[in-house]
């Protein structure tokens, strides 16, 4: 009898707690999670889904893959009443744009506010998983697309070797051992040993397909599954993430946001500035998008700045040294308008990049590169802080945007307009008049992005960081 009374009291206080949490002062509790809201979640059997991406993928792509897997985890927990599924966060090791190639093994909390993630889905850092189970998983899976017979409705289960063997660095290393197979994990962080391996071939590798595969696998007595090459999973629609409360759970940690906000407050001293991501090193070789010469890009940024009555241009770039040389040589009289973030605190290059992203995120207008994931992540964040209007997020435009035979790139934009602002042109006249007619037309061409690719709601998690924006 006492046990029943205690149980009833437990439920009573749980209900009271959830009612209190819907007050406006605690908006964060309005997130209707699918595991903390279950009173018996602590009694469920713990299952783990590990994943990684192609070796050497960039930071922003790896960040994006998290959304794909988080939706899988969300749906698994929503359906299952017996098990609770944890997403194992792979450590950050080898990342393409980092100078330090190996030996990082950084936790996600080094960059992100993981407490926010935990409010919606169960997560665990790989370091914690390894303490529990070592570098072992029960089964690893991969996927490949059926390209020759798209109408095929069923999927195929193939030997693991028939998936991308070069990406997986897979080998069978001990036929008589319980964990027979071995594969590289999360760049060059470590290797994972597994008992079984399978390759699934299908014409639509969506998060629903992967969820279904995992549901079937966990019917057996297993604890963990490793998903290799999870970049194969299709990008979810924005509304799928929104309906699952997942679209805004990847927020940078307080330390990095503070660095960015302090720079805006103490150095820029205004929120009315424009920002731009100028990417050059590897984008010089993208035939579909011709990046403009640095001096052309800088004059276009000045033009946009004067049109919008701003006085500051913040630039994030992989060619910062070269850009500053051009400014000193050709734009000396406009030098006071250009700002760059300097790594005075000797931060990790991943941290430095995040701070640049946040400064760009909070700007009045952002000018990016439509093919860059760095740009895409800034635009995503901007839409979450009510800076998603079409005139606030502009693309620099391909240098050949005005060529008649470049219709393909034109179709990548929501709209393209030619703006001739006499007042703004007068302020750059001494340089503008020396450019060719082709370059003048490019400077006057403004490209606008599609808004449907991004969320359209204001994030409650970001509210405290943008009070003055």
Curated annotation (Swiss-Prot):
State any GO CC term. endoplasmic reticulum
Q: Which reaction does it catalyse?
A: L-seryl-[protein] + GDP-beta-L-fucose = 3-O-(alpha-L-fucosyl)-L-seryl-[protein] + GDP + H(+); L-threonyl-[protein] + GDP-beta-L-fucose = 3-O-(alpha-L-fucosyl)-L-threonyl-[protein] + GDP + H(+)
* Principal cellular location given in the protein's record: endoplasmic reticulum
Q: Name one GO biological process term.
A: fucose metabolic process
Domain of life of the source: Eukaryota
Annotated site residue numbers, Essential for catalytic activity? 381
Q: Which GO terms fall under molecular function for this chain's record?
A: peptide-O-fucosyltransferase activity
Entry-linked PANTHER family: GDP-FUCOSE PROTEIN O-FUCOSYLTRANSFERASE 2 (PTHR13398:SF0)
Free-text function comment from the UniProt entry: Catalyzes the reaction that attaches fucose through an O-glycosidic linkage to a conserved serine or threonine residue in the consensus sequence C1-X-X-S/T-C2 of thrombospondin type I repeats (TSRs) where C1 and C2 are the first and second cysteines of the repeat, respectively. O-fucosylates sporozoite proteins CSP and TRAP. O-fucosylation regulates stability and intracellular trafficking of TRAP but not of CSP.
UniProt name for this protein: GDP-fucose protein O-fucosyltransferase 2
State the encoding gene: POFUT2
